[in-house]
């Protein structure tokens, strides 16, 4: 297992190097001049040129790149032009908000999609099977920002059941003492159940938006994988041996159907990292997605580069976790590693 993990980490290094190079080049190719934005609309050409020199943008591209990689090697992502704060600090402060939203959306999606896919596979052609197909089609068809706007319109504007979509907490509540950065967990640790209730109420709509978006591929893959396994010889043998239907489905069929589902979960999580950007803008969520969008609009290179690199590292770590889960579920993966 350790050998397999070491190999995966070695294979990830070229990918991260490629991400650093491509991100650097793409940010420099974006339209707009950070020096002009930072100087303001009334600045003269001399003032803009002076700021450009101060930011190092007058240097050759290769020199800028080596300076950037040297800073990265020391853990320095640079400073944001719009906030004046270190990018690493901004990302560290905002990442828990994005993580809490993404993880809750994924957990809700898994809790609905996997049982729905299993029921659809064990009852093909029934109403639950048709419900699964309709749900997956709707989840794939609806853009994530449209789903979010519809939920806000229905549950906040029309029905008044949801609080205003303006961040992680209601204005009348203060953040719990920071332990993990996740408000739900920190509020429980502090035994502040009012803050927990407020944080959960703010999370429901954006998490539901992500859950609807991610539910479709998980349910569809669960259904397809279960159908394939249920038609296999060892399942027919288990049924012929007189085992109960629940034992056959859960112990034999579902465990063997899990590998494709786990692969889908890794892809869905990566999709959610991208969809998070739109959801955070719709719900004014103070995560790294909205931070990256604001930096992109203002041609602020450092936050965009820091955001992309953070997402790449998270994706590499996610794939490593998936590989470890493969080894836990299927011993053949450990032997091949």
Where are these regions (language model features)?
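Alpha-helical transmembrane segments of integral membrane proteins
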Residues: 2-3, 95-128, 144, 175-337
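Hydrophobic alpha-helical transmembrane segments of membrane transport/permease proteins
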Residues: 15-66, 155-195
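Hydrophobic alpha-helical segments embedded in or immediately adjacent to the lipid bilayer
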Residues: 115-119, 128-182
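Short amphipathic alpha-helical coupling elements at transmembrane boundaries
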Residues: 3, 7, 40, 50-53, ...
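An internal, D/E-rich "acidic patch" concept
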Residues: 58-114
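Hydrophobic alpha-helical transmembrane segments
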Residues: 41-56, 147-160, 205-210, 247-264
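N-terminal signal-anchor/first transmembrane alpha helix
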Residues: 1-60, 88, 92-93, 110, ...
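Juxtamembrane/transmembrane-helix interface segments of polytopic membrane transporters
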Residues: 19, 23-27, 148, 152, ...
């Amino acid at each position: 297992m350790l050998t397999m993990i070491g190999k995966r980490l070695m294979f990830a290094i070229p990918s991260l190097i490629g991400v650093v190079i491509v991100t650097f080049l793409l940010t420099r190719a974006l339209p707009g001049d950070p020096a002009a934005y930072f100087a303001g609309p009334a600045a003269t050409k001399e003032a803009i040129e002076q700021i450009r020199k101060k930011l190092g943008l007058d240097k050759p591209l290769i020199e800028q790149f080596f300076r950037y990689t040297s800073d990265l090697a020391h853990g320095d992502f640079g400073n944001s032009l719009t906030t004046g704060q270190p990018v690493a600090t901004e990302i560290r402060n905002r990442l828990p908000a994005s993580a809490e939203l993404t993880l809750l959306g994924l957990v809700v999606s898994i809790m609905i999609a996997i049982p729905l896919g299993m029921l659809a596979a064990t009852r093909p052609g029934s109403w639950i099977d048709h419900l699964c197909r309709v749900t997956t089609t709707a989840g794939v068809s609806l853009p994530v920002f449209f789903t979010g706007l519809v939920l806000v319109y229905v549950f906040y504007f029309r029905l008044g059941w949801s609080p205003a979509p303006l961040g992680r907490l209601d204005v009348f509540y203060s953040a719990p003492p920071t332990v993990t950065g996740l408000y739900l967990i920190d509020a429980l640790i502090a035994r502040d159940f009012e803050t927990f209730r407020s944080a959960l109420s703010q999370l429901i709509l954006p998490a539901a938006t992500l859950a609807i978006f991610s539910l479709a591929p998980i349910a569809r893959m669960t259904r397809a994988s279960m159908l394939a396994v249920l038609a296999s010889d060892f399942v027919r043998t288990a049924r012929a041996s007189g085992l109960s239907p629940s034992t056959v489905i859960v112990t034999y069929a579902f465990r063997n159907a899990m590998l494709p589902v786990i692969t889908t979960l890794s892809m869905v999580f990566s999709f959610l990292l991208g969809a998070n950007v739109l959801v955070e803008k719709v719900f004014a969520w103070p995560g790294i997605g909205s931070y990256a969008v604001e930096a992109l609009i203002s041609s602020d290179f450092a936050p965009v580069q820091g955001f992309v690199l953070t997402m790449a590292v998270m994706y590499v770590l996610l794939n490593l976790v998936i590989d470890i889960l493969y080894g836990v579920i299927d011993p053949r993966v450990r032997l091949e590693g």
